[in-house]
């Protein structure tokens, strides 16, 4: 996990990070089911003093992944997260929130939301990670991001227009506000239902953080 006070762009780009082995997380082993009963507020997960805003529709519980494209741990977490999403509770409404711990994180935030707006996110999200962590290309400025997008076949003028658009700027601002609402201190991290927060710091591993997230998804229903 990259903590807010520890990272640097150069070190993150330089460390590819081994791809962690993901596991299904669907039919949990009995030991994991028993362990769920022992998850503790304050150690395994945190409860926000003030609820964070959510975008989940009625009847759904929002799970947010906080990430940074330059983070090797976020890159390694992708297969684990993909496996969890395939077997996550059906009432989960999942979304990602790119963080900004420094002003020079903003190009990655804008890239994410431009790809989303142009319908290219599913196709290119993982390729951004690959470009940074395997090909060792830095995408930490607007010109570098724009040049990369053009290589992916995206119209240069349309990308530039969207990159600087009001809608993308609004999403970037809201993502940073959400990060602050959850008091995110490192990535990857998970926010649940606008009320709960867990990460490798609390859970001791992101595998376990996903188990805790599954447990937390059920808590709003129990509390209702």
Named regions from a protein language model:
Residues 2-103, 218-224:
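Extracytoplasmic thiol/disulfide redox context detector
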Residues 67-70, 81, 85-88, 115-119, ...:
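Sec/Tat-exported extracytoplasmic proteins
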Residues 62-65, 76, 80-83, 106-110, ...:
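Extracytoplasmic/secreted proteins, especially bacterial periplasmic and envelope-associated proteins
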Residues 70-73, 100-104, 131-135, 168, ...:
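Solvent-exposed loop/turn segments at secondary-structure junctions
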Residues 6, 151-224:
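C-terminal cap of thioredoxin/glutaredoxin-like
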Residues 87-118, 122-149:
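Structural microenvironment flanking redox-active thiols in thiol-disulfide oxidoreductases
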């Amino acid at each position: 996990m990259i903590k807010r006070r520890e990272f640097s762009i150069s070190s993150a780009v330089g460390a590819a990070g081994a791809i962690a082995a993901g596991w299904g997380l669907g039919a949990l082993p009995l030991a994991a089911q028993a362990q769920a009963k022992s998850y503790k507020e304050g150690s395994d997960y945190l409860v926000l003093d003030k609820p964070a805003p959510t975008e989940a529709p009625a009847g759904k519980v929002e799970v947010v992944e906080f990430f940074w494209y330059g983070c090797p741990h976020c890159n390694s977490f992708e297969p684990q997260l993909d496996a969890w999403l395939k077997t996550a509770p059906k009432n989960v409404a999942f979304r990602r929130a790119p963080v900004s711990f420094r002003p020079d994180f903003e190009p990655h935030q804008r890239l994410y939301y431009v790809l989303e707006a142009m319908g290219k996110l599913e196709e290119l999200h993982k390729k951004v990670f690959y470009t940074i962590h395997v090909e060792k290309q830095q995408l930490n400025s607007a010109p570098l991001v724009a040049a990369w997008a053009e290589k992916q076949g995206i119209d240069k003028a349309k990308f530039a227009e969207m990159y600087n658009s009001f809608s993308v700027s609004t999403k970037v601002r809201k993502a940073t506000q959400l990060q602050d609402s959850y008091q995110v201190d490192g990535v990857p991290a998970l926010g649940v239902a606008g009320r709960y927060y867990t990460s490798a710091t609390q859970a001791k591993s992101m595998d376990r953080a996903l188990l805790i997230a599954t447990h937390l998804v059920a808590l709003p229903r129990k509390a209702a």
